[in-house]
């Protein structure tokens, strides 16, 4: 077994923000920039090499090459280009737009509204922050426009799920932490085991298995438990449940957002998008069987994503309780001796439901 530590990489969002910062500095200082420093959302500082700088009167262009580390990411090596332009004596505003190789959202249910460029909220926020940082002392009113492009983005997007999700014409600018963690199932499951061991060793009677960081944050806000009690299981639901059962954890809380809980409810023990598709047809059948939700069957069949269904139904309480009850049923099948609860985290940091 190799002892090599897997190398982290950077998200397209982090690379785009770095390229924007470099182009903004070039525009402000009227000089070339070869490297920029960036504080990532996860709190880690990072340095990015800047390439292809071109400077004209009111425009500046450059690009950053995405390094995905040891993660098998199709966008590894992609060039994230940015062209910055400034128009003086206009309304003070910052415009972020997509160009060649950046997709547009055509279906509901995603974090970005239909019709918008597929630049997700966290990368967009990062970009706004670096622009405000660079032009903090700007006195003359001006419109700053940043055009983000990926030359081969449309071709690369064919290797992703973008088209199925309704993102057409290219890639998405993604990321919530700024870093890409290498996918290593063995490393991840080893971490789950170790985390559960630590929780028990620290006296935890309840272990919270979170599908992601956003869900974990919601759980931490609402549960008065020690830090060690929170375990990031990621997509490894089945493994994490069996780990808790084998270690005789008294109580387990499964915390996740709606789309992940739908996957678990459908019986998928591994919930990564490449290994289990969200089975909205199954959900439609469940809705049909319950009088309070039968009228939503067709909506489920026509939904683009599970999140789309949740939002389109107006966060229907009966739908939420149905999915959470199905998750409890699956948990009982996987680990029948463990006391279980399910927490549904919203997409905006709120708690939507917590089973009794």
UniProtKB/Swiss-Prot annotation:
GO terms for molecular function: cobalt-precorrin-5B C1-methyltransferase activity. Its EC number is 2.1.1.195. The keyword NAD does not apply. The keyword S-adenosyl-L-methionine applies. Pathway: Cofactor biosynthesis; adenosylcobalamin biosynthesis; cob(II)yrinate a,c-diamide from sirohydrochlorin (anaerobic route): step 6/10. Transmembrane segments: none annotated. GO terms for biological process: anaerobic cobalamin biosynthetic process; methylation. Pfam families: CbiD. It catalyses: Co-precorrin-5B + S-adenosyl-L-methionine = Co-precorrin-6A + S-adenosyl-L-homocysteine. Belongs to the CbiD family. This is Cobalt-precorrin-5B C(1)-methyltransferase. It comes from Citrifermentans bemidjiense (strain ATCC BAA-1014 / DSM 16622 / JCM 12645 / Bem). The lineage of its organism: Bacteria, Pseudomonadati, Thermodesulfobacteriota, Desulfuromonadia, Geobacterales.
